[in-house]
């Protein structure tokens, strides 16, 4: 049971995250919330290639893109576009105010994608290897791509679209692919 917009968090969610938000990681008896913390924990505790660069400049870029993902991309893509689009019924989607707001967000997301596209020119956001910010950004791209107008936005960001294709082909991504309801 997770929270949905317009509804209070469930008691179950509040027991594991007092802020009532997802994601939450449960690993044995250990519970951790907040995406960046979860990603770092996964990197530190599970086998596989490191997801954090060791070189100081690359590590700083990683931290920059983690911040961008949390403070710009998540609000723009998820909070102000995907969630409203997902929960809007046909009547709401035809409402002029809603349409205006979604058009404004589309413009903002197109700008975000143009910035991301330049960053993804070398393959991944921090260069030629998959890192923690990619773990945070690509699921947002997944949800954007599932929304009306999302695939069209990605056309103007070919490097992001290519990274998204490669991300979806990763075993870890395929095993955790979120199912979207047929509503869309």
In which residue ranges do the predicted regions lie?
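GST-like domain detector, emphasizing the conserved glutathione-binding G-site
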Residues: 1-100
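Residue-level signal for nonpolar/aromatic packing positions in well-ordered secondary structure
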Residues: 25, 38, 62, 116, ...
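Residue-level recognition of oxygen-bearing side chains
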Residues: 37, 159, 172
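Residues at helix-coil transition
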Residues: 43-47, 121, 169
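GST-like fold's C-terminal all-alpha helical module
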Residues: 71-168
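Charged phosphate-binding loop/patch that engages nucleotide di/tri-phosphates or the phosphate backbone
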Residues: 176
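C-terminal helix/juxtamembrane-tail motif
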Residues: 181-184
